[in-house]
Amino acid sequence: SFSDTIKQCDRIQVDGKVREMTDDDRLRAKKANAEYASRGLRSMALAYRVIDRDVDINKMPIDEAESHLIFVGLTTMSDPPRPEIYDAVKRCHQAKIRIIMVTGDSKLTAKSVAVQIGLTSGKARVISGNELEKMSDDELRKALKGEVIFARVAPEQKYRIVKNCQANGEVVASTGDGVNDAPALKQADIGIAMGQTGTDVAKEAANMILTDDNFASIVAAIEEGRAVYSNIRKFLTYILTSNVPEAIPSVLFLFSAGLIPLPMTVMQILTVDLGTDMLPALGLGAEAADPDIMNQPPRKRSEHLLNKGVMIKAFCWYGLLSSLISSGAYFFVNWQNGWPAKGLAASGSVYMRATTMVLGAIVFTQIANVLNCRTNKTSIFKKGLFSNKNIWYGIVFEICL
Protein backbone atom coordinates (compact mmCIF):
# COMPACT_ATOMS: atom_id res chain seq x y z
CA SER A 1 0.00 0.00 0.00
CA PHE A 2 0.98 3.65 -0.32
CA SER A 3 1.34 4.17 3.43
CA ASP A 4 3.63 1.14 3.84
CA THR A 5 5.80 2.09 0.87
CA ILE A 6 6.23 5.77 1.76
CA LYS A 7 7.45 4.83 5.25
CA GLN A 8 10.38 2.93 3.75
CA CYS A 9 11.47 5.81 1.50
CA ASP A 10 14.21 8.23 2.59
CA ARG A 11 15.08 9.64 -0.84
CA ILE A 12 13.12 10.87 -3.84
CA GLN A 13 13.84 11.02 -7.56
CA VAL A 14 12.93 14.35 -9.18
CA ASP A 15 13.69 15.11 -12.85
CA GLY A 16 16.04 12.13 -12.99
CA LYS A 17 18.03 13.24 -9.93
CA VAL A 18 17.95 11.62 -6.50
CA ARG A 19 17.93 13.70 -3.32
CA GLU A 20 16.89 13.40 0.29
CA MET A 21 13.15 13.18 0.84
CA THR A 22 11.81 16.07 2.92
CA ASP A 23 8.67 16.37 5.02
CA ASP A 24 7.20 18.60 2.30
CA ASP A 25 7.78 15.84 -0.25
CA ARG A 26 5.95 13.35 1.96
CA LEU A 27 3.10 15.80 2.51
CA ARG A 28 2.68 16.41 -1.23
CA ALA A 29 2.70 12.67 -1.93
CA LYS A 30 0.08 12.05 0.77
CA LYS A 31 -2.14 14.84 -0.56
CA ALA A 32 -1.89 13.47 -4.10
CA ASN A 33 -2.73 9.97 -2.86
CA ALA A 34 -5.74 11.30 -0.92
CA GLU A 35 -6.94 13.23 -3.98
CA TYR A 36 -6.81 10.12 -6.16
CA ALA A 37 -8.52 8.01 -3.48
CA SER A 38 -11.34 10.54 -3.07
CA ARG A 39 -12.07 10.12 -6.79
CA GLY A 40 -12.37 6.36 -6.38
CA LEU A 41 -9.00 5.62 -8.00
CA ARG A 42 -6.61 3.00 -6.71
CA SER A 43 -3.13 4.41 -6.30
CA MET A 44 0.16 2.57 -5.98
CA ALA A 45 3.45 4.05 -4.81
CA LEU A 46 6.52 3.26 -6.94
CA ALA A 47 9.95 3.07 -5.32
CA TYR A 48 13.24 1.28 -5.86
CA ARG A 49 16.62 0.66 -4.28
CA VAL A 50 20.03 0.28 -5.90
CA ILE A 51 21.95 -2.78 -4.66
CA ASP A 52 25.55 -3.66 -5.53
CA ARG A 53 26.04 -6.52 -7.97
CA ASP A 54 28.12 -8.53 -5.54
CA VAL A 55 25.25 -8.62 -3.00
CA ASP A 56 23.06 -11.75 -3.12
CA ILE A 57 19.57 -10.28 -2.79
CA ASN A 58 18.10 -13.72 -2.13
CA LYS A 59 20.04 -13.89 1.12
CA MET A 60 19.08 -10.40 2.29
CA PRO A 61 16.38 -10.12 4.98
CA ILE A 62 13.16 -8.74 3.53
CA ASP A 63 13.09 -5.85 5.99
CA GLU A 64 16.56 -4.78 4.87
CA ALA A 65 15.84 -5.22 1.17
CA GLU A 66 12.69 -3.10 1.41
CA SER A 67 14.26 -0.23 3.37
CA HIS A 68 16.02 3.00 2.31
CA LEU A 69 13.98 3.12 -0.87
CA ILE A 70 13.96 5.90 -3.48
CA PHE A 71 10.46 7.26 -4.06
CA VAL A 72 9.58 7.70 -7.75
CA GLY A 73 5.92 8.65 -7.76
CA LEU A 74 2.35 7.41 -7.87
CA THR A 75 0.44 5.48 -10.48
CA THR A 76 -3.33 5.16 -10.45
CA MET A 77 -5.77 2.60 -11.74
CA SER A 78 -9.46 2.99 -12.42
CA ASP A 79 -11.70 0.03 -11.63
CA PRO A 80 -15.16 1.42 -12.37
CA PRO A 81 -18.23 -0.39 -11.01
CA ARG A 82 -20.30 -2.40 -13.46
CA PRO A 83 -23.22 -0.41 -14.90
CA GLU A 84 -25.82 -2.72 -13.36
CA ILE A 85 -24.50 -2.26 -9.81
CA TYR A 86 -26.29 1.06 -9.35
CA ASP A 87 -29.75 -0.41 -9.89
CA ALA A 88 -28.86 -3.51 -7.85
CA VAL A 89 -27.87 -1.42 -4.82
CA LYS A 90 -31.02 0.69 -5.17
CA ARG A 91 -33.20 -2.42 -5.23
CA CYS A 92 -31.46 -3.77 -2.13
CA HIS A 93 -32.27 -0.54 -0.28
CA GLN A 94 -35.90 -0.83 -1.38
CA ALA A 95 -36.00 -4.43 -0.15
CA LYS A 96 -34.53 -3.39 3.23
CA ILE A 97 -31.39 -5.43 2.57
CA ARG A 98 -28.26 -3.96 4.15
CA ILE A 99 -25.02 -4.04 2.19
CA ILE A 100 -21.76 -3.81 4.15
CA MET A 101 -18.67 -3.10 2.07
CA VAL A 102 -15.57 -5.01 3.20
CA THR A 103 -12.57 -4.14 1.04
CA GLY A 104 -8.82 -4.08 1.00
CA ASP A 105 -8.78 -0.58 -0.51
CA SER A 106 -7.98 2.55 1.48
CA LYS A 107 -10.62 4.29 3.57
CA LEU A 108 -10.93 7.20 1.13
CA THR A 109 -11.25 4.94 -1.91
CA ALA A 110 -13.80 2.70 -0.19
CA LYS A 111 -15.97 5.63 0.88
CA SER A 112 -15.73 7.27 -2.54
CA VAL A 113 -16.84 4.10 -4.34
CA ALA A 114 -19.64 3.54 -1.79
CA VAL A 115 -21.01 7.04 -2.41
CA GLN A 116 -20.58 6.65 -6.17
CA ILE A 117 -22.71 3.49 -6.37
CA GLY A 118 -25.33 4.78 -3.92
CA LEU A 119 -24.36 2.42 -1.11
CA THR A 120 -24.21 5.27 1.39
CA SER A 121 -25.00 8.96 1.50
CA GLY A 122 -21.49 9.72 2.73
CA LYS A 123 -22.28 9.63 6.44
CA ALA A 124 -21.17 6.03 6.90
CA ARG A 125 -18.48 5.24 9.44
CA VAL A 126 -15.33 3.88 7.82
CA ILE A 127 -13.36 1.41 9.93
CA SER A 128 -9.89 0.24 8.92
CA GLY A 129 -8.48 -3.19 9.59
CA ASN A 130 -6.15 -1.80 12.28
CA GLU A 131 -9.09 -0.11 14.03
CA LEU A 132 -11.12 -3.30 13.76
CA GLU A 133 -8.30 -5.23 15.42
CA LYS A 134 -8.51 -2.96 18.47
CA MET A 135 -12.31 -3.06 18.78
CA SER A 136 -14.08 -5.38 21.20
CA ASP A 137 -16.96 -7.55 19.98
CA ASP A 138 -19.45 -5.31 21.79
CA GLU A 139 -18.05 -2.22 20.05
CA LEU A 140 -18.13 -3.99 16.70
CA ARG A 141 -21.73 -5.14 17.15
CA LYS A 142 -22.73 -1.59 18.00
CA ALA A 143 -20.95 -0.25 14.91
CA LEU A 144 -22.62 -2.87 12.71
CA LYS A 145 -26.07 -1.55 13.63
CA GLY A 146 -25.40 1.66 11.70
CA GLU A 147 -23.96 2.58 8.31
CA VAL A 148 -20.45 1.19 8.22
CA ILE A 149 -17.71 0.47 5.69
CA PHE A 150 -14.64 -1.67 6.36
CA ALA A 151 -11.42 -0.73 4.56
CA ARG A 152 -7.92 -2.21 4.51
CA VAL A 153 -9.42 -5.35 6.00
CA ALA A 154 -7.64 -8.69 5.82
CA PRO A 155 -9.72 -11.64 4.60
CA GLU A 156 -9.34 -13.30 8.00
CA GLN A 157 -11.16 -10.38 9.63
CA LYS A 158 -14.28 -10.98 7.52
CA TYR A 159 -15.05 -14.00 9.69
CA ARG A 160 -15.31 -11.77 12.76
CA ILE A 161 -17.54 -9.29 10.93
CA VAL A 162 -19.88 -12.08 9.78
CA LYS A 163 -20.05 -13.63 13.24
CA ASN A 164 -20.91 -10.33 14.95
CA CYS A 165 -23.57 -9.54 12.34
CA GLN A 166 -25.18 -12.85 13.22
CA ALA A 167 -24.90 -11.97 16.92
CA ASN A 168 -27.05 -8.93 16.10
CA GLY A 169 -29.74 -11.27 14.77
CA GLU A 170 -28.97 -10.68 11.09
CA VAL A 171 -29.18 -13.28 8.32
CA VAL A 172 -25.82 -12.88 6.61
CA ALA A 173 -24.72 -13.59 3.05
CA SER A 174 -20.97 -13.24 2.54
CA THR A 175 -19.01 -13.18 -0.71
CA GLY A 176 -15.41 -14.20 -1.22
CA ASP A 177 -12.94 -15.71 -3.66
CA GLY A 178 -9.72 -16.46 -1.79
CA VAL A 179 -8.52 -19.26 0.44
CA ASN A 180 -8.57 -16.93 3.45
CA ASP A 181 -12.25 -16.13 2.77
CA ALA A 182 -13.26 -19.73 3.48
CA PRO A 183 -13.92 -19.29 7.25
CA ALA A 184 -16.26 -16.33 6.58
CA LEU A 185 -18.04 -18.21 3.78
CA LYS A 186 -18.50 -21.21 6.06
CA GLN A 187 -19.76 -19.11 8.98
CA ALA A 188 -22.25 -17.07 6.93
CA ASP A 189 -25.84 -18.21 6.55
CA ILE A 190 -25.25 -18.04 2.79
CA GLY A 191 -21.67 -18.28 1.57
CA ILE A 192 -21.26 -17.04 -2.00
CA ALA A 193 -18.03 -17.85 -3.85
CA MET A 194 -16.94 -16.27 -7.11
CA GLY A 195 -17.20 -18.70 -10.00
CA GLN A 196 -14.63 -17.08 -12.31
CA THR A 197 -11.98 -15.82 -9.87
CA GLY A 198 -12.75 -17.98 -6.83
CA THR A 199 -10.38 -20.65 -5.55
CA ASP A 200 -11.45 -24.26 -5.13
CA VAL A 201 -11.24 -23.87 -1.35
CA ALA A 202 -13.65 -20.91 -1.41
CA LYS A 203 -16.07 -22.76 -3.69
CA GLU A 204 -15.99 -25.80 -1.42
CA ALA A 205 -16.79 -23.69 1.66
CA ALA A 206 -19.60 -21.74 -0.04
CA ASN A 207 -23.29 -22.59 -0.32
CA MET A 208 -23.62 -20.93 -3.71
CA ILE A 209 -21.27 -20.17 -6.60
CA LEU A 210 -21.76 -16.95 -8.55
CA THR A 211 -20.88 -17.98 -12.09
CA ASP A 212 -20.57 -14.45 -13.51
CA ASP A 213 -19.00 -12.77 -10.42
CA ASN A 214 -21.69 -10.10 -10.67
CA PHE A 215 -23.35 -8.60 -7.58
CA ALA A 216 -26.50 -7.87 -9.61
CA SER A 217 -26.96 -11.63 -10.04
CA ILE A 218 -27.24 -11.98 -6.25
CA VAL A 219 -30.06 -9.43 -6.22
CA ALA A 220 -31.78 -11.27 -9.08
CA ALA A 221 -31.47 -14.53 -7.11
CA ILE A 222 -33.05 -12.88 -4.06
CA GLU A 223 -35.97 -11.70 -6.18
CA GLU A 224 -36.42 -15.16 -7.67
CA GLY A 225 -36.27 -16.75 -4.23
CA ARG A 226 -38.91 -14.38 -2.90
CA ALA A 227 -41.11 -15.13 -5.91
CA VAL A 228 -40.84 -18.90 -5.36
CA TYR A 229 -41.63 -18.54 -1.65
CA SER A 230 -44.61 -16.32 -2.44
CA ASN A 231 -45.90 -18.78 -5.05
CA ILE A 232 -45.74 -21.66 -2.57
CA ARG A 233 -47.94 -19.65 -0.21
CA LYS A 234 -50.35 -18.88 -3.04
CA PHE A 235 -50.44 -22.59 -3.89
CA LEU A 236 -51.22 -23.51 -0.27
CA THR A 237 -53.93 -20.85 -0.01
CA TYR A 238 -55.63 -22.15 -3.14
CA ILE A 239 -55.42 -25.83 -2.20
CA LEU A 240 -56.56 -25.36 1.41
CA THR A 241 -59.55 -23.21 0.43
CA SER A 242 -61.48 -26.06 -1.20
CA ASN A 243 -61.25 -28.11 2.00
CA VAL A 244 -63.67 -25.75 3.76
CA PRO A 245 -66.71 -26.17 1.46
CA GLU A 246 -65.98 -29.90 1.45
CA ALA A 247 -65.79 -30.13 5.24
CA ILE A 248 -68.64 -27.87 6.39
CA PRO A 249 -71.43 -29.95 4.73
CA SER A 250 -70.03 -33.03 6.44
CA VAL A 251 -70.19 -31.20 9.75
CA LEU A 252 -73.82 -30.24 9.04
CA PHE A 253 -74.58 -33.88 8.26
CA LEU A 254 -73.16 -34.97 11.61
CA PHE A 255 -74.84 -32.28 13.71
CA SER A 256 -78.22 -32.78 11.99
CA ALA A 257 -78.16 -36.49 12.80
CA GLY A 258 -78.50 -37.29 9.10
CA LEU A 259 -81.43 -34.96 8.37
CA ILE A 260 -79.17 -33.04 5.96
CA PRO A 261 -77.59 -35.61 3.60
CA LEU A 262 -74.01 -35.16 2.45
CA PRO A 263 -74.07 -32.45 -0.24
CA MET A 264 -71.07 -34.04 -1.96
CA THR A 265 -70.40 -37.65 -2.77
CA VAL A 266 -66.99 -39.21 -2.19
CA MET A 267 -66.37 -39.28 -5.94
CA GLN A 268 -67.12 -35.57 -6.24
CA ILE A 269 -64.72 -34.73 -3.39
CA LEU A 270 -61.97 -36.74 -5.10
CA THR A 271 -62.80 -35.00 -8.38
CA VAL A 272 -62.14 -31.61 -6.77
CA ASP A 273 -59.02 -32.64 -4.85
CA LEU A 274 -57.30 -34.77 -7.48
CA GLY A 275 -58.80 -33.43 -10.68
CA THR A 276 -60.06 -29.89 -10.95
CA ASP A 277 -57.70 -28.28 -8.40
CA MET A 278 -54.39 -29.72 -9.57
CA LEU A 279 -53.63 -27.96 -12.86
CA PRO A 280 -54.62 -24.43 -11.72
CA ALA A 281 -52.55 -25.00 -8.57
CA LEU A 282 -49.53 -25.99 -10.65
CA GLY A 283 -50.11 -22.89 -12.77
CA LEU A 284 -49.69 -20.77 -9.63
CA GLY A 285 -46.18 -22.18 -9.31
CA ALA A 286 -45.28 -20.50 -12.60
CA GLU A 287 -46.74 -17.13 -11.56
CA ALA A 288 -44.46 -14.14 -12.16
CA ALA A 289 -43.27 -12.20 -9.13
CA ASP A 290 -45.48 -9.40 -7.84
CA PRO A 291 -44.24 -5.97 -9.01
CA ASP A 292 -43.66 -4.84 -5.41
CA ILE A 293 -41.93 -7.99 -4.19
CA MET A 294 -38.60 -6.16 -3.84
CA ASN A 295 -40.25 -3.31 -1.94
CA GLN A 296 -41.06 -5.59 0.99
CA PRO A 297 -38.73 -6.13 3.97
CA PRO A 298 -37.23 -9.60 4.51
CA ARG A 299 -39.43 -11.99 6.46
CA LYS A 300 -38.48 -12.90 10.00
CA ARG A 301 -36.34 -15.98 10.52
CA SER A 302 -39.03 -17.45 12.80
CA GLU A 303 -41.87 -16.95 10.31
CA HIS A 304 -43.42 -20.19 9.07
CA LEU A 305 -44.43 -20.95 5.50
CA LEU A 306 -47.97 -21.77 6.61
CA ASN A 307 -48.51 -18.66 8.71
CA LYS A 308 -51.53 -16.96 10.24
CA GLY A 309 -52.19 -14.88 7.12
CA VAL A 310 -52.44 -17.95 4.87
CA MET A 311 -54.72 -19.75 7.33
CA ILE A 312 -57.07 -16.78 7.73
CA LYS A 313 -57.27 -16.18 3.99
CA ALA A 314 -57.83 -19.86 3.14
CA PHE A 315 -60.20 -20.88 5.93
CA CYS A 316 -61.89 -17.71 7.18
CA TRP A 317 -62.24 -15.71 3.97
CA TYR A 318 -62.06 -17.58 0.66
CA GLY A 319 -63.08 -20.91 2.19
CA LEU A 320 -66.00 -19.50 4.16
CA LEU A 321 -67.29 -17.59 1.15
CA SER A 322 -67.05 -20.70 -1.02
CA SER A 323 -68.92 -22.68 1.66
CA LEU A 324 -71.76 -20.17 1.76
CA ILE A 325 -72.12 -20.24 -2.03
CA SER A 326 -71.95 -24.04 -2.39
CA SER A 327 -74.23 -24.72 0.61
CA GLY A 328 -76.64 -22.07 -0.64
CA ALA A 329 -76.74 -23.78 -4.04
CA TYR A 330 -77.49 -27.11 -2.35
CA PHE A 331 -80.39 -25.80 -0.28
CA PHE A 332 -81.69 -23.68 -3.18
CA VAL A 333 -82.13 -26.73 -5.46
CA ASN A 334 -83.95 -28.58 -2.70
CA TRP A 335 -86.14 -25.58 -1.95
CA GLN A 336 -87.06 -25.25 -5.64
CA ASN A 337 -88.23 -28.85 -5.61
CA GLY A 338 -90.53 -28.48 -2.61
CA TRP A 339 -88.27 -29.04 0.39
CA PRO A 340 -90.68 -28.99 3.39
CA ALA A 341 -87.94 -28.09 5.91
CA LYS A 342 -88.50 -31.43 7.67
CA GLY A 343 -85.78 -33.38 5.98
CA LEU A 344 -83.97 -33.80 2.68
CA ALA A 345 -83.92 -36.71 0.31
CA ALA A 346 -80.71 -38.71 0.41
CA SER A 347 -81.26 -40.16 -3.05
CA GLY A 348 -83.16 -39.57 -6.23
CA SER A 349 -82.98 -37.01 -9.03
CA VAL A 350 -83.38 -33.99 -6.72
CA TYR A 351 -80.44 -35.11 -4.60
CA MET A 352 -78.31 -35.70 -7.70
CA ARG A 353 -79.12 -32.24 -9.07
CA ALA A 354 -78.34 -30.69 -5.68
CA THR A 355 -74.94 -32.39 -5.36
CA THR A 356 -74.13 -31.45 -8.96
CA MET A 357 -74.89 -27.81 -8.15
CA VAL A 358 -72.57 -28.02 -5.14
CA LEU A 359 -69.77 -29.42 -7.29
CA GLY A 360 -70.31 -26.72 -9.91
CA ALA A 361 -70.38 -24.00 -7.26
CA ILE A 362 -67.08 -25.19 -5.75
CA VAL A 363 -65.44 -25.42 -9.17
CA PHE A 364 -66.42 -21.87 -10.12
CA THR A 365 -65.52 -20.43 -6.70
CA GLN A 366 -62.14 -22.13 -7.07
CA ILE A 367 -61.72 -20.44 -10.46
CA ALA A 368 -62.29 -17.09 -8.75
CA ASN A 369 -60.00 -18.23 -5.94
CA VAL A 370 -57.07 -19.08 -8.21
CA LEU A 371 -57.34 -15.68 -9.89
CA ASN A 372 -57.43 -13.98 -6.48
CA CYS A 373 -54.40 -15.95 -5.31
CA ARG A 374 -52.29 -14.72 -8.23
CA THR A 375 -51.60 -11.41 -6.51
CA ASN A 376 -51.57 -10.37 -2.87
CA LYS A 377 -51.90 -6.60 -3.13
CA THR A 378 -52.24 -5.29 -6.67
CA SER A 379 -55.25 -5.76 -8.93
CA ILE A 380 -55.26 -8.83 -11.15
CA PHE A 381 -56.09 -6.55 -14.10
CA LYS A 382 -53.03 -4.41 -13.36
CA LYS A 383 -50.81 -7.48 -13.28
CA GLY A 384 -52.38 -8.88 -16.44
CA LEU A 385 -55.45 -11.09 -16.40
CA PHE A 386 -54.12 -13.41 -19.13
CA SER A 387 -50.38 -13.06 -18.42
CA ASN A 388 -50.17 -16.56 -16.89
CA LYS A 389 -51.42 -18.90 -19.61
CA ASN A 390 -50.75 -22.02 -17.51
CA ILE A 391 -53.51 -21.05 -15.09
CA TRP A 392 -55.99 -20.56 -17.93
CA TYR A 393 -55.11 -23.97 -19.39
CA GLY A 394 -55.88 -25.40 -15.96
CA ILE A 395 -59.17 -23.48 -15.74
CA VAL A 396 -60.30 -24.79 -19.15
CA PHE A 397 -59.41 -28.33 -18.06
CA GLU A 398 -61.28 -27.79 -14.78
CA ILE A 399 -64.45 -26.69 -16.57
CA CYS A 400 -64.28 -29.52 -19.10
CA LEU A 401 -63.79 -32.10 -16.37
What residue ranges belong to the model's regions?
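Cytosolic catalytic headpieces and adjacent flexible linkers of membrane translocases
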Residues: S1-N164, N168, A182, Q196-T197, ...
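Membrane-embedded transport module
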Residues: S121-S174, A188, A193-T378
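C-terminal membrane-solvent junction of multi-pass transporters and transport-like membrane proteins
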Residues: L306, M311, K377-I399
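Basic, alpha-helical nucleic-acid-binding regions used in initiation and control of genome expression
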Residues: L185
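Conserved catalytic-loop aspartate of Hanks-type protein kinases
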Residues: D177
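Hydrophobic, membrane-inserted alpha-helices
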Residues: I248-P249, E398-L401
